Design a protein with these regions (language model features):
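Acidic, low-complexity, intrinsically disordered interaction modules
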Residues: 19-71
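Long, compositionally biased, charged low-complexity segments
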Residues: 11-12, 70, 74-82
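N-terminal acidic leader/helix
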Residues: 2-28
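Short, solvent-exposed polar/charged micro-motifs at secondary-structure junctions
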Residues: 14-15, 47-48, 82-84
Length: 85
């Protein structure tokens, strides 16, 4: 089952900065896509990371250590477990 983890670019950058380029976690995070949303002439950006549940839990553990503000966003994605076909 694939999970779509959707977090703010600031939280994403904070978590990513804790890992070296050789780290498996770095590779998982780098698979994220920056998505631009437009609402009432305002632009909002999010980073979407499509991964399996195991990797989503790894991202959650990293957020708990390095960016507690991102935990709720990631927990919600895991809870919803949106599947893509």
């Amino acid at each position: 089952m694939k999970i779509l983890v959707d977090i703010s670019p600031e939280h994403y950058d904070r978590i990513l900065s804790e890992f070296s380029e050789e780290s498996p976690m770095y590779a998982i995070l780098k698979n994220g896509l920056v998505i631009h949303h437009f609402e009432a002439s305002n632009e909002f950006r999010t980073v979407e990371i499509l991964c399996d549940k195991f990797h989503a839990r790894m991202i959650l553990a990293a957020a708990e250590m390095y960016c507690p503000q991102a935990v709720a966003e990631i927990e919600e994605a895991i809870r919803l477990s949106r599947t893509l076909h």
